[in-house]
Amino acid sequence: MPFFLKELSLTISLHPSYFGPRMQDYLKAKLLADVEGTCSGQYGYIICVLDSNTIDIDKGRVVPGQGFAEFEVKYRAVLWRPFRGEVVDAIVTTVNKMGFFANIGPLNVFVSSHLVPPDMKFDPTANPPNYSGEDQVIEKGSNVRLKIVGTRTDATEIFAIATMKEDYLGVL
């Protein structure tokens, strides 16, 4: 999986009750809470903020008429963005006749029944429902290796379509 280091910035508004000697610590804590684990459509998933002790916080400015202060906070972050053609390991979350859904960390992936190997058939009578072949079973909780064939990016989420119809892909 390709991870990236990126310099990012965020404007944080601060209520006057937080002004004081611990203001820098509060801004750092707010940055970590607001950014880590989120998804930016432009950059991908923000996994973590690096060097949290050396985050660059500018002097800030008071917003006229409100009393709030705005601070521009610059930080380095580890990002993950899925790419078409990337081979990944996933955990199956839902199985139905149309295909199955799986999670790759925070990323939701759909594998259509047309992108499952032809020897694997959907068995709706099984408990839980699954796709089964000669020696493989795909059911909720199964670990599978997939290849991403397409991604769709929204403002706060990334969704992917994947396949299992290639060599070395399938149930692990």
UniProtKB/Swiss-Prot annotation:
UniProt keyword RNA-binding present: no
Matching SUPFAM superfamilies? N-terminal, heterodimerisation domain of RBP7 (RpoE), Nucleic acid-binding proteins
Tell me a GO cellular component. nucleus
One biological process term from GO is: transcription initiation at RNA polymerase II promoter
Per UniProt, what is one GO molecular function of this protein?
A: translation initiation factor binding
- Give the superkingdom in one word: Eukaryota
Q: Where in the cell is it found?
A: Nucleus
Q: Mostly located where?
A: nucleus
> What are the alphabetically sorted keywords of the record?
DNA-directed RNA polymerase, Nucleus, Transcription
Q: How does it assemble?
A: Component of the RNA polymerase II (Pol II) complex consisting of 12 subunits. RPB4 and RPB7 form a subcomplex that protrudes from the 10-subunit Pol II core complex. Interacts with seb1.
PANTHER family for the chain:
DNA-DIRECTED RNA POLYMERASE II SUBUNIT RPB7, DNA-DIRECTED RNA POLYMERASE II, III
Q: Which family does it belong to?
A: Belongs to the eukaryotic RPB7/RPC8 RNA polymerase subunit family.
**Protein role:** DNA-dependent RNA polymerase catalyzes the transcription of DNA into RNA using the four ribonucleoside triphosphates as substrates. Component of RNA polymerase II which synthesizes mRNA precursors and many functional non-coding RNAs. Pol II is the central component of the basal RNA polymerase II transcription machinery. It is composed of mobile elements that move relative to each other. RPB7 is part of a subcomplex with RPB4 that binds to a pocket formed by RPB1, RPB2 and RPB6 at the base of the clamp element.
Q: Could you tell me what this protein is called? A: DNA-directed RNA polymerase II subunit rpb7
